[in-house]
A protein has these predicted regions:
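Glycine-rich, acidic/polar active-site loops that bind/position phosphate-bearing ligands
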Residues: 1-86, 94-98, 104-260
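Glycine-rich N-terminal segment of FAD-binding domains in flavoprotein oxidoreductases
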Residues: 90
Length: 260
């Protein structure tokens, strides 16, 4: 391990260097010209590591835009006499890079089908899709894992950084409680989202974030979507999303067959 490393997290909590910020501004401008919405500028854990967040879009468009983002990052870095490393684990002993794929389904007139609403235990559409997704990932975790298996990513996953290499689902306490009640024969009591009281009368109550903020699960429910965190940084998102769409479609088809 080199002397200048990531143990003290001084890069993570430090300010963005002017030279890097100029690069980020040029990247934003290039992406906006291409019609690609993106945001977020901040340091990541490893020295010289940074994050960019393309904004949610329809899946086929988001995948195409993600490929363009990678190209823009490389070309813009060269203009600034820098190199953009998209390898998942370019240096041993330091954090690697990956993509977080936020996945949901929507329908005309319904909006997001993974939006729990104010009373998720009574939202039949949400619960059906939630159970179908859980079933799909449980039965086809091997396919989902294989969709992100490449040499660079294998050096990153399951090491000393999130997420683990074993596919698991995190739902949060609220949805866990609802699923457990359904398993026992139906929801017997109301399940409400917890709130945070910060002790200041002039400020409102804030909803408690139920997601795993330390990224311990590669497939987690985050508010109104699932977040697949195991995709490699140099990888196209097309294949993992194709696999996810297919296995969930199979689960929904089986549920529909049972109901019919």
């Amino acid at each position: 391990v080199p002397p200048k490393h990531q143990q003290m997290e001084d890069h993570y909590f430090g300010s963005i260097k002017d030279r890097v910020l100029e690069f980020m501004v040029d990247v934003d401008e290039a992406l906006w010209k291409l019609g690609i919405p993106a945001k977020t500028r901040h340091n990541e854990v490893a020295p010289g590591q940074f994050e960019i967040a393309p904004i949610f879009e329809s899946q086929n468009l988001a995948v195409d835009h993600n490929m363009l983002v990678m190209e823009v990052l490389r070309k813009t870095a060269n203009k600034h006499d820098m190199v953009c490393l998209l390898h998942e684990k370019p240096f041993s002993g330091m954090n690697g890079s990956g993509k977080h794929n936020n996945w949901s389904l929507s329908a005309p007139g319904y909006g997001s089908l993974l939006n729990p609403g104010s009373s998720p235990q009574e939202n039949a559409i949400f619960l059906t899709l939630l159970c179908a997704t859980i079933k799909a990932v449980d039965e086809h975790a091997d396919l989902l894992r294989a969709s992100v298996a490449k040499s660079g990513n294998e050096h990153r996953l399951g090491a000393h950084e999130a997420p683990p290499a074993i596919i698991s689902i995190f739902l949060g306490d609220l949805l866990d409680e609802i699923i457990e009640q359904i398993e026992k024969g139906g929801t017997k009591k109301a399940c409400t989202q917890k709130t945070i009281n910060i002790g200041v009368d002039t400020l409102p109550m804030f909803p408690l974030d139920a997601s795993d903020r330390n990224r311990t699960s590669p497939f987690a429910f985050t508010g109104n979507k699932f977040e697949f965190r195991a995709v490699g940084s140099s990888q196209t998102c097309a294949w993992p999303m194709t696999v996810l769409n297919t296995i969930v479609a199979e689960s929904l088809d089986e549920i529909c067959t049972i109901l019919e």
